[in-house]
């Protein structure tokens, strides 16, 4: 009996919803066209709630640290099969405040170097001090080179070019008349064509 009562009440509610006048559910169209051509879902749709993106970018992890971070939101799904990149492997270092991400090859290379250094220290072998520069002659040459603004090296071409421009400026005053006549003759020949006709 109770199931039949529920069915009757459900039918009455759905029938009451169907009996709403069209003015409440569809907007009036002043141009005389039928109002069925307008999509009512787009007019009355509610704004969509935006959720957290489950795959945060590892480079912005510190910026979005307040949000809950799950490295693998779907435990049964392998990210490699989905074509997504896995986040980098953080280094095991106490001095780093935030994790530094490297790829797998870099990580294994770092581990190999650490192991070899640990073996050398265990054998009490002194680690060679690195030279401050590779070649003494290059260092001495760099010391002798002239430097410009900001400590950068000056190019020899630019230095020679600057001196040549100054010399040319003084000599151009003396020969300005001769050069202007040569330029005008070259211009006249270029405009006249190969046979001397314009």
Curated annotation (Swiss-Prot):
Residues 24-44 have a biased composition (Polar residues). The lineage of its organism: Eukaryota, Viridiplantae, Streptophyta, Embryophyta, Tracheophyta. One of its GO terms (biological process) is regulation of timing of transition from vegetative to reproductive phase. GO terms for molecular function: DNA binding; DNA-binding transcription factor activity. Residues 1-47, 136-198 are annotated as: Disordered. Keywords: Activator, DNA-binding, Nucleus, Transcription, Transcription regulation. Its main location: nucleus. Stimulates the transcription of various genes by recognizing and binding to a CCAAT motif in promoters. Heterotrimeric transcription factor composed of three components, NF-YA, NF-YB and NF-YC. NF-YB and NF-YC must interact and dimerize for NF-YA association and DNA binding. Residues 7-23, 156-166 have a biased composition (Basic and acidic residues). It is found in: Nucleus. SMART domains: CBF. Belongs to the NFYA/HAP2 subunit family. The keyword Transit peptide does not apply. One of its GO terms (cellular component) is nucleus. The keyword Transcription applies. Expressed in stems, caulines, and senescent flowers. This is Nuclear transcription factor Y subunit A-4. It comes from the Eukaryota. InterPro entries: CCAAT-binding_factor_CS, NFYA. A motif (Subunit association domain (SAD)) lies at residues 101-124.
